[in-house]
């Protein structure tokens, strides 16, 4: 067996990010051949990924990348098994690499990004293989749980990541004054993070769902012995409260408890003689 030098072990460690002892073992198994040692470690990572496929990966981070002109954005949730790994530079760097790739290639789902090649820093591996390699390096199951891409040729995209990177949001505005709308978009991204709306406006709430809610509230009122003449008003009030909870534009603005989000949008329109509407938003919270 050829002599394995510390220099070779360090070089392999720097190249792959795998632990020193595993690098030494790989070089020993491949007779000191650096390329074969790299392939050996990749196969070992794939084998470990297969072994850990049934493990729970509930820790991780939410990561976001925005284009320089804020016309595009990508958000993802990358999972691992422990909080220790989730906070490490290797894991967070990998998450940033993935979301940057998704942004650059306009990938709209985990499936869409799996066949794409990463940068030279990750050996130009395809994402699917790189996840296996990362599993080998970190010794934990790595799972790209979800990913979404926004594009706004007719507006602007802003984002917010809460400290700790376990909650992130993106908001897409349609506006003819994108530069002036940046601060508004940032505020709305924070609004989505804090208040967790489900839809942008009332029209997005399915009519059949509201009908079911009305019947539920009606039966509850009857069960409480409310008089028939008061029930309609009670039900209407509860439906309004529901809208205020789940509809973004109906929510109380986080920066002013006396103002609704819809009022903030109207104020912007008047102040800047501009058109602005919320086209879409996304909210990722770790584990949801």
From Swiss-Prot:
Pfam families tied to this protein: EF_TS (PF00889)
What the entry lists under InterPro entries is as follows: EF-Ts_dimer_sf, Transl_elong_EFTs/EF1B, Transl_elong_EFTs/EF1B_dimer, Transl_elong_Ts_CS, UBA-like_sf
Tell me the GO molecular function terms: translation elongation factor activity
Among the entry's GO cellular component annotations, what is one?
Answer: cytoplasm
- Which CDD domains does the record match to this protein? UBA_EF-Ts (cd14275)
Which keywords does UniProt give here? Cytoplasm, Elongation factor, Protein biosynthesis
Where does it localize? Cytoplasm
Q: Where is this region: Involved in Mg(2+) ion dislocation from EF-Tu?
A: 82-85
- What protein family does this chain belong to? Belongs to the EF-Ts family.
Q: Which HAMAP family has this protein been placed in?
A: EF_Ts
What does the UniProt record say this protein does?
Answer: Associates with the EF-Tu.GDP complex and induces the exchange of GDP to GTP. It remains bound to the aminoacyl-tRNA.EF-Tu.GTP complex up to the GTP hydrolysis stage on the ribosome.
- Name-wise, this protein is Elongation factor Ts
């Amino acid at each position: 067996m050829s002599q394995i030098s510390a220099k070779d072990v360090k070089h392999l460690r720097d190249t792959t990010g795998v632990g020193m002892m595993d690098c030494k073992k790989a070089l020993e198994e491949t007779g000191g051949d650096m390329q074969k040692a790299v392939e050996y470690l990749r196969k070992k990572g794939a084998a470990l990924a297969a072994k850990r496929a049934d493990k729970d990966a509930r820790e991780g981070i939410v990561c976001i990348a925005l284009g320089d002109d804020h016309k595009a954005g990508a958000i993802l949730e990358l999972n691992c098994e422990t909080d220790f790994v989730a906070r490490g530079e290797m894991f967070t760097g990998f998450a940033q690499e993935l979301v940057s790739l998704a942004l650059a290639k306009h990938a709209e789902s985990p499936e869409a990004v799996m066949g794409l090649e990463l940068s030279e820093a990750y050996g130009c591996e395809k994402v699917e293989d790189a996840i296996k390699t990362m599993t080998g390096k970190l010794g934990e199951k790595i799972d790209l749980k979800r990913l979404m891409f926004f594009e706004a040729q007719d507006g602007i995209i802003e984002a917010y990541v809460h400290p700790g990177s376990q909650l992130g949001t993106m908001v897409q505005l349609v506006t003819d004054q994108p530069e002036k709308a940046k601060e508004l978009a940032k505020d709305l991204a924070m609004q989505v993070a804090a208040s967790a709306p489900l839809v942008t406006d009332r029209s997005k709430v399915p009519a059949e769902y509201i009908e079911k809610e009305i019947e539920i509230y009606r039966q509850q009122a009857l069960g409480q012995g409310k008089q028939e003449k008061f029930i309609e008003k009670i039900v209407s009030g509860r439906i309004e409260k529901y809208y205020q909870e789940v509809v973004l534009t109906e929510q109380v603005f986080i920066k002013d408890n006396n103002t609704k989000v819809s009022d903030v949008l109207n104020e912007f329109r008047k102040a800047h003689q501009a058109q602005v509407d919320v086209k879409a938003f996304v909210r990722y919270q770790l584990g949801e």
